[in-house]
């Protein structure tokens, strides 16, 4: 069981690493421009990007586990229909979101914490990025179906192709062509287009076990409900992440100004990198757990949960120790402005104080999603972000903590939300499977 999980998790972890580089390489390059306004402007776009990714996860992470479960039962025709319906949903969401966000981008950006200084940078980036929304939907939303069929290396290549294109084009567009944030956005859109074409080529080709076919694209209400119900967990997590980013940026803008919005952009970038292996391992276990659960191999599911828990927690503790030891070194990867570093180091240590507890949330969530328990997955997605982090982000700064209150909300939520999710999974899933 451990070998099966690692066979899925290692390529997915590499894919997650590449995907993180894909997402943060813009920030690394823009951080090298004079000042911090370009980096801050990009940071203001991140909540909107999280929303777009949330809709992609709604379809991809909702449909892919269902495909694994039906494959385990030998029901490949139904698995293909889920694949086709998920693709149609991605197209519909992508088109609607593009029109809406382009029409209302100015009020949205100011609502999300933009100032008159940072709005031009955020607007330039977002306008171009939104033109590639369909590419984001297809590349991110359809790639989990590669993993659901056991082609985790192909899933890794989808991400690797986009990342390579982005890394190569970024310095050309940003510096050589002097396009600044517009160049970063254009490079990202072209990279996402390459990823989308790659994943479509595979899923319509002969190698795929489950193919994307014309006769599976017509939406069927019951099937759509199942996809959306299971995908709601990933969707809610992305939405609540976006909500927290908005509240953080707005609070930091109020209590600390543009500088602290830039600090949070750097912190979020580092968090994405260090949490990447946790996401790779827990995402990698989902198709294995789902397949064995569908086949009735409950003891193998229990062994998979044990292995995933030990591996994930072990990594998280080691990563936490490293992060707390060298904050300045990590911050300088993105920006070396003395003012930002001076403000960033104490904020960094406060934000990451209980980082290792975040792995508990990922473990519980992955088990719930992998076994098709959508209600539990949705509840714990909401609990940590919407019911703990968001209120604390508003409450603590007003109690005299200022910007420190914004950063302190994260470790509190990691402990409370993470433990609640892990313990509930143990009682309601792990123990019951052993009976």
What is the role of each PLM region?
Residues 34-47, 122, 126, 185, ...:
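Small-residue hotspots at the loop-to-helix junctions and early N-terminal turns
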Residues 7-26, 128, 162, 191-195, ...:
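Transmembrane helical elements of multi-pass membrane transporters/channels
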Residues 1-28, 32-33, 47-62, 66, ...:
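N-terminal transmembrane alpha-helices
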Residues 1-9, 67-134, 176-232, 289-354, ...:
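Short alpha-helical transmembrane segments in multi-pass integral membrane proteins
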Residues 60, 129-147, 155-163, 184-197, ...:
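Short runs within selected transmembrane alpha-helices of multi-pass transporters and secretion channels
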Residues 39-99, 136-155, 249, 263-321, ...:
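Small-residue-rich hydrophobic transmembrane alpha-helices
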Residues 17, 21-40, 109-116, 172-179, ...:
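Helix-terminus/linker motif at the lipid-water interface of multi-pass membrane proteins
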Residues 51-54, 166-171, 196-200, 272-276, ...:
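Hydrophobic transmembrane alpha-helices of multi-pass small-molecule transporters
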């Amino acid at each position: 069981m451990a070998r099966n999980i690692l066979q899925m998790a290692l390529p997915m972890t590499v894919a997650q690493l590449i995907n993180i580089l894909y997402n943060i390489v813009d920030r690394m390059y823009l951080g090298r421009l004079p000042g911090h306004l370009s980096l801050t402007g990009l940071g203001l776009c991140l909540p909107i990007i999280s929303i777009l990714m949330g809709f992609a996860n709604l379809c991809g992470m909702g449909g892919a586990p269902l495909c694994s479960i039906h494959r385990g039962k030998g029901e490949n025709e139904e698995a293909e229909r889920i694949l086709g319906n998920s693709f149609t949903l991605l197209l519909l969401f992508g088109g609607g979101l593009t029109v809406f966000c382009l029409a209302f981008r100015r009020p949205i950006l100011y609502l999300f914490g933009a100032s008159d200084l940072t709005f031009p940078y955020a607007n330039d980036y977002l306008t171009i990025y939104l033109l590639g929304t369909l590419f984001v939907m297809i590349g991110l939303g359809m790639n989990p179906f590669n993993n659901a069929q056991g082609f985790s290396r192909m899933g890794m290549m989808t991400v690797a192709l986009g990342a390579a294109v982005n890394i190569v084009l970024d310095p050309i567009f940003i510096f050589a062509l002097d396009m600044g944030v517009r160049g970063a956005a254009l490079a990202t859109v072209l990279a996402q287009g390459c990823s989308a074409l790659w994943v479509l080529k595979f899923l319509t080709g002969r190698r795929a076990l489950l193919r994307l076919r014309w006769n599976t694209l017509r939406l069927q209400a019951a099937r759509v409900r199942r996809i959306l119900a299971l995908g709601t967990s990933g969707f809610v997590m992305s939405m609540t992440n976006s909500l927290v980013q908005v509240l953080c940026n707005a609070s930091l803008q109020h209590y600390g100004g543009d500088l602290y919005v830039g600090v949070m952009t750097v912190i979020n970038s580092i968090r994405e990198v260090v949490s990447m292996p946790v996401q790779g391992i827990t995402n990698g276990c989902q198709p294995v757990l789902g397949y064995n659960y569908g086949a009735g191999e409950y003891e193998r599911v229990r062994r998979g949960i044990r292995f995933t828990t030990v591996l994930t927690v072990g990594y998280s503790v080691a990563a936490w120790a490293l992060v707390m030891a060298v904050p300045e070194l990590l911050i300088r990867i993105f920006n070396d402005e003395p003012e930002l570093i001076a403000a960033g180091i104490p904020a960094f240590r406060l934000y990451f104080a209980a980082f290792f507890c975040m792995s508990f949330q990922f473990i519980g969530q992955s088990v719930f999603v992998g076994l098709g328990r959508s209600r539990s997955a949705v509840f714990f997605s909401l609990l940590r972000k919407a019911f703990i982090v968001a209120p604390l982000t508003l409450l603590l700064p007003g109690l005299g903590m200022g910007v420190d209150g914004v950063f302190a909300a994260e470790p509190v939520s990691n402990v409370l939300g993470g433990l609640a999710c892990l313990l509930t999974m143990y009682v309601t899933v792990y123990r019951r499977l052993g009976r």
